[in-house]
UniProtKB/Swiss-Prot annotation:
Species of the source: Xenopus laevis (African clawed frog)
Name of the protein: Hemoglobin subunit beta-2
Domain Globin: from-to ranges: 3-147
InterPro entries associated with the record: Globin, Globin-like_sf, Globin/Proto, Hemoglobin_b, Hemoglobin_oxygen_transport
Keywords, alphabetical: Heme, Iron, Metal-binding, Oxygen transport, Transport
Family per record: Belongs to the globin family.
Length: 147
C-alpha cells in the first residue's frame, strides 16, 4: 500500500478539479498517438490517424481519451486503494486488448505534460512530484494483470 501525505493528496485532487476529461483526455491520447505512433496499432478501428490533424479531428480519439481520463478520475477517487480499483481494467488490457504495459508509462508521461501545459506555473515541482508518484501507482495498478 502506498503512503500518501495530505499535501500529495491535495495536489492531486486540486489539479484533477481543473481537468476537463473530454478536452484533456483527447489532448493526452492524441499526443500519445502522435509522439509514439506505434501505439496506433491498438486503435486500428479509429480510422485515419496518419498525421497530427487527423488525430486532432478524430472523434474516436476524443471519446476514448475521455474514457481513459474518466478511469484516471476513478483511480483518484480511490487513491488509498488504486491498485485494487484497477484490477478489472488491468485484466482487460492484459488478456483481451494485449496492450504492452510500457504504454501505460508513456501515457502517464504524456498526461503529466498535458497537465503542466494546462496549469503553467501552478504546476509546481511539488505538484508534479505528487502527480509523478500517482502515475507510478496508476501504472503499477494497470500492470498487475500481466504475468
Amino acid at each position: 500500500m502506498v503512503h500518501w501525505t495530505a499535501e500529495e493528496k491535495a495536489a492531486i485532487t486540486s489539479v484533477w478539479q481543473k481537468v476537463n476529461v473530454e478536452h484533456d483526455g483527447h489532448d493526452a491520447l492524441g499526443r500519445l498517438l502522435i509522439v509514439y505512433p506505434w501505439t496506433q496499432r491498438y486503435f486500428s478501428n479509429f480510422g485515419n490517424l496518419s498525421n497530427s490533424a487527423a488525430v486532432a479531428g478524430n472523434a474516436k480519439v476524443q471519446a476514448h481519451g475521455k474514457k481513459v481520463l474518466s478511469a484516471v478520475g476513478n483511480a483518484i477517487s480511490h487513491i488509498d486503494s488504486v491498485k485494487s480499483s484497477l484490477q478489472q481494467l488491468s485484466k482487460i488490457h492484459a488478456t483481451e486488448l494485449f496492450v504492452d504495459p510500457e504504454n501505460f508509462k508513456r501515457f502517464g508521461g504524456v498526461l503529466v505534460i498535458v497537465l503542466g501545459a494546462k496549469l503553467g506555473t501552478a504546476f509546481t515541482p511539488k505538484v508534479q512530484a505528487a502527480w509523478e508518484k500517482f502515475i507510478a501507482v496508476l501504472v503499477d495498478g494497470l500492470s498487475q494483470g500481466y504475468n
